[in-house]
Amino acid sequence: MKQRISALDLLLLARELKQDLEGYRLSNIYNIADSSKQFLLKFNKPDSKLNVVVDCGLRIYLTEFSRPIPPTPSGFVVKLRKHLKAKRLTALKQVDQDRILVLQFADGHFYLVLEFFSAGNVILLDENRRIMALQRVVLEHENKVGQIYEMFDESLFTTNNESADESIEKNRKAEYTSELVNEWIKAVQAKYESDITVIKQLNIQGKEGAKKKKVKVPSIHKLLLSKVPHLSSDLLSKNLKVFNIDPSESCLNLLEETDSLAELLNSTQLEYNQLLTTTDRKGYILAKRNENYISEKDTADLEFIYDTFHPFKPYINGGDTDSSCIIEVEGPYNRTLDKFFSTIESSKYALRIQNQESQAQKKIDDARAENDRKIQALLDVQELNERKGHLIIENAPLIEEVKLAVQGLIDQQMDWNTIEKLIKSEQKKGNRIAQLLNLPLNLKQNKISVKLDLSSKELNTSSDEDNESEGNTTDSSSDSDSEDMESSKERSTKSMKRKSNEKINVTIDLGLSAYANATEYFNIKKTSAQKQKKVEKNVGKAMKNIEVKIDQQLKKKLKDSHSVLKKIRTPYFFEKYSWFISSEGFLVMMGKSPAETDQIYSKYIEDDDIYMSNSFNSHVWIKNPEKTEVPPNTLMQAGILCMSSSEAWSKKISSSPWWCFAKNVSKFDGSDNSILPEGAFRLKNENDQNHLPPAQLVMGFGFLWKVKTSGNEDNGDDDEEEEEEEEEEEEEEEEEEEEEEEEKEEEEKEEEQQQDEDDSNEVNGLEKGGDSNDSTKNNSFEHDNLEKDIEKHCTISSDTDSDSGNAKAKNDNSSTQRILDEPGVPISLIENINSNVRGKRGKLKKIQKKYADQDETERLLRLEALGTLKGIEKQQQRKKEEIMKREVREDRKNKREKQRRLQALKFTKKEKARVNYDKHKSELKPSLDKGDVVDDIIPVFAPWPALLKYKYKVKIQPGSAKKTKTLTEILHYFKSRPLDGSSTDNEMDWPQEHEMIKGLKEQDLVLLLCVDKLKVTIAGQKSTKNGGNSSKKGKKKR
């Protein structure tokens, strides 16, 4: 089975992935269950979502099927998420003439390198191509964290990869002649002859190991692939077979076929060019027949097992047409790989079960054969003992003679060894009695072994039986040939001679007569027959137990949870909310959060729709796209949802909801026209409320079936774009929340830093000052020097008489600004200058005159000697940072204000999302009819009256059971209901429905339940008790 993509496959896949993925954002990265080398990359952008499967070193492709994901990611995936999550894929390119794919994120800030040669690797690089993380460490290449990755450079993305295009174009224009092919083969022949000469010289010199060396000649397939490596190995092999050339044949044998080889290469090159340039993409899958397939038992999809995939039509020999088939897949080549691997993974479980069943059947057959062998052994023992008993009776006189002869020697008190030597001597002399005895004698147990020939009576009996059978055969088949008759007579004569020569050893007890010895054998036969009956009886029970045990093991393995690949279905827009479809076909929605409530109102609610609420501040919406009167049953069902989703469920309060038309609802405050908080609405006219009777808190859980309808496959949901816009808005809101949290953290850090600095300055001041008087003097001296410094920078106009007050103020401001620009002036003094303090200007003039001759160097030296220069620099740096942070906060504030204005526009716009509600009604069915093609199963949590037409439903009421336990019990109940194998009775469950229910997991259904603490009521069973076991009876009264 093909597991690794070839160089041609990667070239085609890279082009498709570049076209499909560039511009998408990587939303998340996951491990795929049962493999640490497989990864799932999820990309999205406002109008679509794409999933990419990466198997390290083996394959990469877009998939339309879901993959099982482990609960916790690996360390490598955590590293990838940290750097690549939410980054945009800006470029995707393949390294020239190499099986390396490079994904560029965030305009070159990060690179994800996928290697598909050898064992493969996945490497994360930073903007300088420095390795940040590796999927596996390869010592041969010395790729380590912190080193520069050298398999590509910046030119791969900066030069638009012109070199790669040039090499591809060069390969595309290549032409091959018979002279060129002849040169290749001649070069191989010359190397072969030189190697032969070297080996002969080694043989002449008598060096060891020379005879063991063999000169290998490359096959024609290997030679062509080494000369034209850009052509795929599979493509060359296919075309060699088309030209009736064995790919494994030696290239030296085709020295006279250079013309056909050149034609083969040119046709292969032409096919290669067509694969790269064609826009009509197709893929092909070669499947082979499953040897374990049983048509009466297995499903049709197990008849053939996928073996290989190619971008070209594979070649099948004429004799393999029955055992192989070619499946053509229309569309991009990614779709071919997705179908190939997804089908293999989906059928892997079924094939495993099929293999386990065959192994179980083999175990049963082996056990049955072992039991048959035991019974046959008992039958053989009975037959042998019966024959021995009859032989002893027939040869009773002979047996007595042998007994008397041996007994006479024993009576003479001869040594047992001497007796055996005497018998051996008599056997050589031809003594008839001695020849019947088997040595050694078992005199210790007073027994001897005697060899008896089959009696003439038994021979006559067997011959009579043969004659009778021959006579019967002749009567029944009078047309038989005379030659067959003669051959059967010859066979019977040979068998009689063989039987006459056959001897049987019989054990004789010297203490018993011949007939008594025969009785012993008949007793053994009787005991064996009784044992046979017991064995046969026990065998029947044992076989039944073995079959039951194996059947239980198979059922247990079938019940074990296994991951089933499901095609990713685009969810309906209302599936992200709490929803149900009423018994009259009206869509009822409720947001799971205040933000979702606002989304429903702004995106989908129109004036003729219904708004429903209650005293617990729950909000439910009823869509009325046809603008008809909403039936009372729908209002009642929506009221049940409204009350059940509130605190009334946990408190078990039966209250009355109320409703009004959506045109009576506003999102703006009536006084200042500002937007109300999330999830809050205002009624324009309080008198338009319509109260309903108290709602019963009875919900239910059931299944809807999405079936294929006309145009179902071609037309997607009309609201996908709206959904993506909502997701973008949610992402923006999350970003704003994160920014606000970051601002709070920064402010807290600044306050802590400021406090620490103030504390450290106070401590330093106490340490340096010595006492309070000295510190006061130093501070006053420092202050005077700074004032003198400032005076130097101040420029006072000499024409004081002509200056007006405004001019003076202006001059003061300009001078102050110039002082502020100097790096060495404290900001606190500058701010004090601007304050109108009496006598300040005169003091500044004196300072300016006093330090008029002081240059910049002397001033800085004085400040450094005083120790105030560093403090001034820190203060200025802090001021700059505060200004920058203030600007960032202003930008964020403006962004949030802009978002609020957009939100206000969202609530005021009249255009709503366009949704085909009739299409949804036709696709979703509460029960299946014969002939329906099911796309998917959709679980629903809805009021019980809305589920009365559903085939699969259970009642849920307030209780104390947990959600997961309740869902487990519900799914177990649905799976254990009886089935209608023919799928004709609409009232009974169908196998197809149970197969889809088995794919559901409790964890995926928990979010559907908008209530907590449940009590489930299942038909024909006792309802789940509140809080587990009932309380024990109270103690007896004293």
Curated annotation (Swiss-Prot):
Pfam families per record: NFACT-C, NFACT-R_1, NFACT_N
Coiled-coil portions: 350-383, 713-768, 830-912
GO cellular component: cytoplasm; cytoplasmic stress granule; cytosolic ribosome; RQC complex
Effect of residue 9 to A: Reduced ability to mediate CAT tailing without affecting binding to 60S ribosome subunits
Keyword Coiled coil on entry: yes
Organism this protein belongs to: Saccharomyces cerevisiae (strain ATCC 204508 / S288c) (Baker's yeast)
Subcellular location field: Cytoplasm
Primary role: Key component of the ribosome quality control complex (RQC), a ribosome-associated complex that mediates the extraction of incompletely synthesized nascent chains from stalled ribosomes as well as their ubiquitin-mediated proteasomal degradation. Thereby, frees 60S subunit ribosomes from the stalled translation complex and prevents the accumulation of nascent polypeptide chains that are potentially toxic for the cell.
The organism's place on the tree of life at top rank: Eukaryota
InterPro entries: NFACT-C, NFACT_RNA-bd, RQC_Subunit_NEMF
General remark: Present with 7700 molecules/cell in log phase SD medium.
Biased composition (Polar residues): 795-805
GO BP of this protein: CAT tailing; peptide biosynthetic process; rescue of stalled ribosome; ribosome-associated ubiquitin-dependent protein catabolic process
Compositionally biased tracts (Basic and acidic residues): 780-794, 877-894
Ranges annotated as biased composition (Acidic residues): 714-761
Keywords in alphabetical order: Coiled coil, Cytoplasm, Phosphoprotein, Protein biosynthesis
Annotated region (Disordered), positions in chain: 459-499, 708-824, 877-898
Protein name: Ribosome quality control complex subunit 2
GO MF annotation: an example: ribosomal large subunit binding
Gene3D superfamilies documented for this protein: ibrinogen binding protein from staphylococcus aureus domain
Subunit structure comment from the entry: Component of the ribosome quality control complex (RQC), composed of the E3 ubiquitin ligase RKR1/LTN1, RQC1 and RQC2, as well as CDC48 and its ubiquitin-binding cofactors associated with the 60S ribosomal subunit. RQC2 binds to the 40S-binding surface of tRNAs.
Modified residues annotated as Phosphoserine in this record: 797
Substitution effect: residue 98 to A: Reduced ability to mediate CAT tailing without affecting binding to 60S ribosome subunits
Keyword Lipid metabolism: no
Family statement drawn from the similarity comment of this UniProt entry: Belongs to the NEMF family.
